[in-house]
C-alpha cells in the first residue's frame, strides 16, 4: 500500500487549508518576532559584550513596537483564516508524507546478507528543539530556520561517510575511525560553536562537499600521530560504544522530536529527502481534539519527524489525551510506522516496525508519563497486530524518542519500573533506577550551551568523554521533594540524565544484538540534547520453528 502524500483527500480541501494558513501566518510570524526580539541567547549576549555593542536596548524597544503594531494589524486577517482553517483539521490526516527517488548514495552494509546469515539496520534519535524562534529562545536556542537546514545537511554528511574498520593493538581502542573535525564550519578565535562571532548561524553547508577521509594506514610516514578514533570502547562496556563528532555511517531511519515549526520541517525534508526518500513530517493534530470537542485546543503538532530509506507501508499517529499545562498545547503522541526493507527470505517479504514518541515534559508529573507509557505499549501492539501479514517476516521493532525521564533520578522511580522495559530491551539500562557504568546522559544544561567546552563537536566530544568535565554540562538527576540527593553512589560513575531512548524488541525468534551505540556531538550549539544512534544486527539463522 502506498501512502498519499497530501494530508487531505483532495486538492480542493488542500487549497482551502493553504489559504486559511496563509491568512494566519503573518500574524503568527509577527508575534514570533515580537517575542524573539525581546529574548537574547547567551551567545548573543556574549557577542554584544565582546563587541561593546550598546544599541541593543534601542533594537528591543523599536522592534517591539514595530512587531506589535504589525501583529495588531494582521489579527483580523488571522481570525478570518482561522475560521477557514480550524474546521478543516477534523478531516486532515495527522501527518504529511514526502516521497522522492534517492539521489545521494549511501554505503550498503547488507550487500552480503545471505552469505553472512545476518542483516543490520541503523537508527538515530534526536530532540532538535525546532520550535518557533521566539519560543526556542527560552531554551537558549535561536535561528530556528537556519538550524533546521544545518541539522539536516549535517545528518546527510555524517551518515553518508564510509564505514571504515581498522584493527589496533590496544584492547580498548578499535573499530571505526572517522574524521574528528566537524562538518559545520569551524569557529575562529572569537566565535562560539556552530555559530559565528556575530551571533548568527553560518550559511548552510553544501551536501555535496567531500567529507575529509582519514588516513587508515597505520604505517604511513605522512601521519605523525595515529588518528584519534572517535570510538571510545570502554573496557567494561558490554556493547561497542562511542562518543562521535560525526553521525554514524549508514543510518537507515532517523527519528526526530520537537520539529514543531512547519517551515523548519520543510527545510529538514528538503535536506534529508535526497537521501531518505520517505519522510513523515507535520505529524499530529491541530485545533480542537478530539474533533468537535473544546476541552483541549492544540496550537502545535506533535513535533515528531521520521525519515526512512525504506518505503513506508503503513503509518499511524495517536495523540496522548492526558497532557497538562503547557504540554497540553502540543499534540504529543506516538507515531507507529511499518516499512518494507526490500528483501525477501524464501517467500516472505522482510519488514520492520519503528515507533517514535515524545512524552510529557514537566518534572513531577511522573503519573502522566506512566499512563502515556501504558498507552504506547498498547498502541504499538494494536498497530502491529492489525498490520501483520502471513507472507511477511518482521525483523525489527524499535521504540525511540524523548521520554522526559531518566534511569537515575529518584523523582522518576515510577516510570523507571514500567513494564515497557520488560517488553523492549534498553541497551543502556542495568536495572530499574540503575544505568550501566559506561552510559552518558543526553540532556545538556541550557545556560552552558555555548561554553568553551561545548561550543564545537570536538570540544563537546572531549567533554562527554571526561567524567570530571561532563558533570558540569549534563543535567544532574532530579531529587525527590524534601529528600537530599546522594549521587553518584560510592564507586559509581557520574552519568547524568539520559532522557533520549533507543529500545528494541526481538521479532520472529531472530536473535537481535546491538552492533554499536553512538553518542553524537555533531549538533553542538544547535540543540540542547545529545543525539543517540545504534545499529542492530539481526541473525537470520536463529528463527524458531
Swiss-Prot record:
Principal EC category: hydrolase
Pathway assigned to this chain's UniProt record: Lipid metabolism; sphingolipid metabolism
Catalytic residues (UniProt): 529
Coiled-coil features, chain-numbered ranges: none
Subcellular location: Mitochondrion inner membrane; Endoplasmic reticulum membrane
Topology Mitochondrial intermembrane: residue spans: 86-545
Glycoprotein listed as a keyword: no
Enzyme Commission (EC) number: 3.1.4.12
pH dependence of this protein's activity: Optimum pH is 7.5.
Site, as annotated: Important for substrate recognition: 404
UniProt GO molecular function: metal ion binding; phospholipase activity; sphingomyelin phosphodiesterase activity
Protein's GO biological process: ceramide biosynthetic process; glycosphingolipid metabolic process; sphingomyelin catabolic process; sphingomyelin metabolic process
Membrane topology: Single-pass type II membrane protein; Single-pass membrane protein
Cross-referenced Gene3D superfamilies: Endonuclease/exonuclease/phosphatase
Known regulation of activity: Activated by the phospholipids cardiolipin, phosphatidylserine, and phosphatidylethanolamine. Strongest activation with cardiolipin.
Cofactor: Mg(2+); Mn(2+)
Residues the entry annotates as binding Mg(2+): 258
Catalytic reaction list: a sphingomyelin + H2O = phosphocholine + an N-acylsphing-4-enine + H(+); N-(hexadecanoyl)-sphing-4-enine-1-phosphocholine + H2O = N-hexadecanoylsphing-4-enine + phosphocholine + H(+)
InterPro entries noted in UniProt: Endo/exonu/phosph_ase_sf, Endo/exonuclease/phosphatase, Sph/SMPD2-like, Sphingomyelinase/PLipase_C
Mitochondrial matrix side: 36-64
Keyword Repeat carried by entry: no
Entry's family note: Belongs to the neutral sphingomyelinase family.
Protein known as: Sphingomyelin phosphodiesterase 5
The encoding gene: smpd5
Amino acid at each position: 500500500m502506498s501512502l498519499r502524500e497530501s494530508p487531505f483527500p483532495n486538492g480542493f480541501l488542500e487549497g482551502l487549508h493553504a489559504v486559511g494558513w496563509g491568512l494566519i501566518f503573518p500574524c503568527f510570524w509577527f508575534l514570533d518576532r515580537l517575542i524573539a526580539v525581546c529574548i537574547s541567547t547567551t551567545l548573543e549576549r556574549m557577542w554584544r559584550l565582546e563587541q561593546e555593542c550598546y544599541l541593543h536596548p534601542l533594537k528591543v524597544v523599536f522592534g517591539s513596537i514595530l512587531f506589535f503594531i504589525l501583529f495588531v494589524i494582521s489579527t483580523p486577517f488571522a481570525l478570518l483564516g482561522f475560521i477557514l482553517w480550524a474546521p478543516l483539521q477534523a478531516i486532515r490526516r495527522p501527518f504529511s508524507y514526502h516521497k522522492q527517488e534517492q539521489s545521494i548514495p549511501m554505503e550498503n552494509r547488507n550487500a552480503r546478507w545471505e552469505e553472512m546469515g545476518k542483516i543490520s539496520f541503523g537508527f538515530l534519535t534526536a530532540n532538535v528543539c525546532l520550535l518557533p524562534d521566539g519560543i526556542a529562545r527560552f531554551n537558549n536556542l535561536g535561528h530556528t530556520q537556519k538550524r533546521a537546514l544545518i541539522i539536516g545537511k549535517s545528518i546527510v554528511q555524517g551518515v553518508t561517510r564510509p564505514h571504515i574498520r581498522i584493527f589496533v593493538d590496544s584492547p580498548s581502542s578499535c573499530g571505526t575511525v572517522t574524521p574528528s573535525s566537524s562538518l559545520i564550519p569551524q569557529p575562529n578565535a572569537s566565535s562560539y560553536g556552530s555559530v559565528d562571532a556575530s551571533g548568527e548561524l553560518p550559511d548552510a553547508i553544501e551536501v555535496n562537499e567531500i567529507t575529509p577521509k582519514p588516513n587508515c594506514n597505520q604505517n604511513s610516514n605522512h601521519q605523525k600521530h595515529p588518528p584519534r578514533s572517535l570510538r571510545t570502547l570502554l573496557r567494561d562496556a558490554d556493547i561497542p560504544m562511542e562518543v562521535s563528532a560525526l553521525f554514524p555511517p549508514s543510518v537507515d531511519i532517523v527519528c526526530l522530536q520537537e520539529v514543531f515549526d512547519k517551515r523548519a520541517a520543510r527545510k529538514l525534508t528538503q535536506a534529508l529527502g535526497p537521501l531518505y526518500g520517505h519522510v513523515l513530517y507535520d505529524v499530529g493534530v491541530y485545533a480542537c481534539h478530539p474533533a468537535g470537542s473544546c476541552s483541549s485546543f492544540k496550537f502545535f503538532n506533535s513535533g515528531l519527524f521520521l525519515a526512512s530509506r525504506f518505503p513506508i507501508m503503513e503509518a499511524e499517529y495517536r495523540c496522548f489525551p492526558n497532557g497538562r499545562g503547557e504540554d497540553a498545547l502540543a499534540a504529543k503522541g506516538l507515531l507507529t510506522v511499518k516499512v518494507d526493507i526490500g528483501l525477501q527470505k524464501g517467500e516472505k517479504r522482510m519488514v520492520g516496525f519503528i515507533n517514535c514518541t515524545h512524552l510529557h515534559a514537566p518534572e513531577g508529573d511522573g503519573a502522566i508519563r506512566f499512563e502515556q507509557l501504558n498507552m504506547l505499549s498498547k498502541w504499538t501492539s494494536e498497530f502491529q497486530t492489525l498490520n501483520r501479514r502471513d507472507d511477511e517476516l518482521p525483523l525489527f521493532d524499535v521504540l525511540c524518542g524523548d521520554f522526559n525521564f531518566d534511569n537515575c533520578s529518584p523523582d522518576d522511580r515510577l516510570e523507571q519500573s514500567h513494564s515497557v522495559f520488560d517488553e523492549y530491551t534498553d541497551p543502556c539500562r542495568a536495572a530499574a533506577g540503575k544505568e550501566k557504568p559506561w552510559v552518558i546522559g543526553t540532556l545538556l544544561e541550557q545556560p552552558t550551551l555555548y561554553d568553551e567546552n561545548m561550543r564545537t563537536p570536538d570540544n563537546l566530544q572531549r567533554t562527554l568523554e571526561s567524567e570530571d568535565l561532563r558533570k558540569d554540562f549534563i543535567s544532574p538527576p532530579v531529587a525527590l521533594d524534601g529528600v537530599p540527593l546522594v549521587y553518584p553512589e560510592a564507586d559509581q560513575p557520574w552519568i547524568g540524565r539520559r532522557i533520549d531512548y533507543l529500545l528494541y524488541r526481538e521479532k520472529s525468534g531472530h536473535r537481535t544484538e546491538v552492533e554499536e551505540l553512538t553518542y553524537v556531538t555533531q549538533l553542538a550549539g544547535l540543540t540542547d540534547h545529545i543525539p543517540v544512534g545504534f545499529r542492530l544486527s539481526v541473525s537470520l539463522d536463529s528463527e524458531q520453528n
